[in-house]
Amino acid sequence: HYVLGNNTINEAIDRIKQHTFPRVNAIIFLLHKPQGLGKQANVLKPSDPRVQEFFELLTAESYYRFGVDSCTVPGMINFGKNYDINSLDTCEAGRFSAYISADMKMVPCSFDTTGKHEVDLRRHTIQEAYDSETFDVFRNKLKFSCPGCKNKADCLGGCSLMPEIVLCNRVTKNKVI
């Protein structure tokens, strides 16, 4: 795994250009998130020319097998050149997946640390949590975000928890109607 952020993207670009991921069978790129020990300063911006260069190189090279986490998918969609859209698995938070913490709180995404979208499984079933108004509100933010965007069906609305990590520079990004 390779965490891709402001502090690592130059190295990632250089390694792809120079084919210097020695004896590596496959690389999974995980987008840096400003959670836990993650710093806001390491969040990549879609306007950074290195972001476009990284995705163009990544999708042009055939020397490595690679994968990306679902948070990185908007970057692939917006900057990648040669990939199969069906190979991408975008964010499914609250739609097809959820996270259950050790204290039995269910949230749409493991990066939701605010408590705003949590449902207590000591008082509710998983089905009740999934069908709850709390989860509906979360899903609707994604469902109605980015109106008119031609890539909405592939990106599914980016990230409502941390919009700053969405590698998209379209004016429709995260706008909710």
Annotate each predicted stretch with a short phrase.
Residues 1-107, 111-121:
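Radical SAM enzyme [4Fe-4S]-AdoMet core and its adjacent flexible, acidic
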Residues 106, 110-177:
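Flexible mid-to-C-terminal extensions adjoining Fe-S/redox cofactors in radical SAM and related proteins
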